[in-house]
């Protein structure tokens, strides 16, 4: 009798953040494509997965958002250890953290720790706790959120034009953010704060999200890893079975040359 060995998951660990389900900006097409094709032992949802800020203001949830949730739960059912670390946009889940709940096999945690195959100890946090605007002046963060959403509208029209010209998806809003002097300074402060916290607590590195800026580099001797987002860049951080860490640019890896059409929103009552 031949007994087949279980298929080894593609990755040892996968980290995704800032999907912002519940907004029109969420790239559910790219995200579902990724979740449906990868497999992993550990899946970390590093905050701002569901955008409670936007859902409180106006309800938007189409079938593509349901599909993303279904795919995450399918990973949990198939044995993937799924850990959800809420951020500031899904802070409603933080009230449940003291209960240590599991929802559909998804563990809710205020933060997490992950040890790679090579022995690196990584702190996993969303990162809003280290953003001075969110921490000290949350009303400014909300105002900034409005300006950010406006940039995403511009980004979508820009990419529609690129689609008609036969060019691949490219994030204009992310490109602008990397070149605005004050934004660059804010990113540097954020990175230094996260790296400092990881060092203070004895970790070798930190995995975060929050600023929608995928990055993998050393900051003052600490490995700083930002998983990016699924609104602008559509990136994920993965750990291979040999412990190697890699940032995946999903649209670029798959040669997406157009934006998939979006289904019409299903009217919902708030």
Q: What is each PLM-predicted segment?
A:
Residues 1-5:
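A short, compositionally biased domain-edge/stem linker segment
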Residues 6-12, 21-117:
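Core catalytic region of metal-dependent phosphoesterases/phosphodiesterases
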Residues 13-15, 43-45, 123, 207:
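Residue-level marker for buried hydrophobic side chains located in beta-strands
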Residues 100-110, 123, 128, 132-142, ...:
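Conserved beta-sheet core of the metallophosphoesterase superfamily
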Residues 250-270:
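C-terminal regulatory/interaction regions
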Residues 19-20, 50, 128, 251:
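Anionic group-transfer/hydrolysis microenvironments
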Residues 125-190:
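Active-site-proximal loop/helix segment associated with metal-binding centers of metalloenzymes
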């Amino acid at each position: 009798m031949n007994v087949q060995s279980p298929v080894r998951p593609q990755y040892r660990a996968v980290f995704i953040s800032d999907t912002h389900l519940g907004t029109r900006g969420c790239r559910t097409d790219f995200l579902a494509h990724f979740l449906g094709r990868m497999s992993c032992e550990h899946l970390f949802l590093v905050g701002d997965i569901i955008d409670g800020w936007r859902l409180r203001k106006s309800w938007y949830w189409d079938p593509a958002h349901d599909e993303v949730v279904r795919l995450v739960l399918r990973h949990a059912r198939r044995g993937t250890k799924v850990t959800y670390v809420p951020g500031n946009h899904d802070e409603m889940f933080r009230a449940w953290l003291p209960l240590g709940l599991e929802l559909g096999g998804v563990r809710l945690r205020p933060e997490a720790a992950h040890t790679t195959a090579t022995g690196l100890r990584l702190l996993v946090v969303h990162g809003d706790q280290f953003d001075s605007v969110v921490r000290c002046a949350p009303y400014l963060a909300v105002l900034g959120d409005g300006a950010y959403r406006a940039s995403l509208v511009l980004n979508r029209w820009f990419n529609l034009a690129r689609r008609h010209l036969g060019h691949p998806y490219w994030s204009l809003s992310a490109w602008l953010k990397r070149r605005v002097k004050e934004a660059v300074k804010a990113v540097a402060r954020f990175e230094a704060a996260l790296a400092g916290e990881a060092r203070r607590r004895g970790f070798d590195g930190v995995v975060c999200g929050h600023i929608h800026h995928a990055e993998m580099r050393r900051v003052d001797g600490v490995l700083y890893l930002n998983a990016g987002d699924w609104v602008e860049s559509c990136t994920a951080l993965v750990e291979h079975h040999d412990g190697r860490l890699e940032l995946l640019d999903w649209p670029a890896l798959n040669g997406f040359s157009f934006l998939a059409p979006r289904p019409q929103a299903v009217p919902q009552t708030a």
